[in-house]
Amino acid sequence: RNYSLCSNPADRDFYQIAVKRDAAGRGGSISMADDVNEGDLLSVSAPRNNFELHPRATKFLFVAGGIGITPVLSMMRHLKTQGNDQFRLIYCTRDPESTAFLEELQGPEFEGKVEFHHDHGDINNALDFWPVFETPTNAHVYCCGPRGMMDAVADMSGHWPSGAVHFESFGVDASAY
């Protein structure tokens, strides 16, 4: 099974992942949540990056839903290490209690960079992405999360320049994010 790294790519001594336990899943997340502890050594293959920052991009808009924050957080950590703070994150979750990395994202390192949207599990409270994408900017967009959220971002950003909007899919269904 593949998992997105959420650690800074510059940190080569360890890999950090975050896995949401899915009782309805095929067992991978249950095993990771129930049988693996922080600090355990696991046999892994070398990372592959199919969702990388565009090398010439200088401004970034990140959109994450639920545990889709993992690759986005890695990118944000990398940009901060590089001295680039030209980014913004829109992070959609059910509620603050289920928001991964909430404390870090509310901390001083990302102050003023993160907008949280909590739908409380009601699709009628999903974020309206049109105001975000109505006017294209020179930012590159990186989106990872549930299929429904990614479809909404794709629909709202269809008029953006080709190659400016990037998606990472990891098999989450279209239920509320």
Annotated model-derived regions:
Residues 60-70:
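Short, glycine-rich nucleotide/cofactor-binding loops
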Residues 93-177:
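Reductase modules of NAD(P)H-dependent flavoproteins
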Residues 69-81:
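Histidine-anchored nucleotide/phosphate-binding helix
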Residues 1-41, 59, 93-96, 104:
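Ferredoxin-reductase
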Residues 47-48:
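Short, surface-exposed secondary-structure boundary micro-motifs
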Residues 57, 78-87:
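Conserved S-adenosyl-L-methionine
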Residues 5, 68, 146:
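Short, conserved phosphate/pyrophosphate- and ester-handling motifs at nucleotide-, phospho-/glycolipid
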